[in-house]
Amino acid sequence: MAKQTIYLTIDDGPSDLTALFLDLLEKYNSRATFFVLGENIEGHQSDIKRICAQGHAIGVHGYCHDYDVVYQSCKVFWEDNLHARKLIEELTGKTPWLMRFQGGSSNTVSKRYCKGIMRKLTRQAASYGYVYHDWNIDSEDWKKQYSAEEILKYIKAEIHDGSYSRPVILLHDRNDLNENVMLVERLLHDLTSEGYTFSVLSKDIIPIHYRVSN
């Protein structure tokens, strides 16, 4: 009996690790969703093209990840976001419809710069042709407090628990997180061996939305 589908989402790339992730996904006949930053595309244009060519999904994570920049106003946020969208569109010939807010839709850091901005942005996303996605399994890899083995154990425990009808894993694609290459290999190897499949966030997937706190 086939087990459930897992949605691996990889934020903040492209980086020098992107091609390695793509190699692993190809090796295990798996798909993922990449939420990319426009400022990282220069020098990695081939990775953006390859993401699409291999059948993965690509979403917009903004041009930059500086909270004090993107969350100063709705106008600035969308200027930043649409700049990144245009870069992706020019490389792939497709207009991305997926997006993920920097820090997620429930972030509270935005309060420092513009009170109530997340309520406005989450309502506005659809008018730009977007569906935004959060996640329900946070690797917390960016904190650098846990080894790849510890993160792997945590993610697998969350999957095996069966509490999520559509598990959406959050990982990051950054040069300072090179242990994530081993982590992704182990995730793909172990879970596909158990009968799980990895697929992309598509339009028929009900998005994970956190409660907006600003």
Show the residue positions of the predicted features.
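N-terminal secretory targeting signals
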Residues: M1-A2, V212-N214
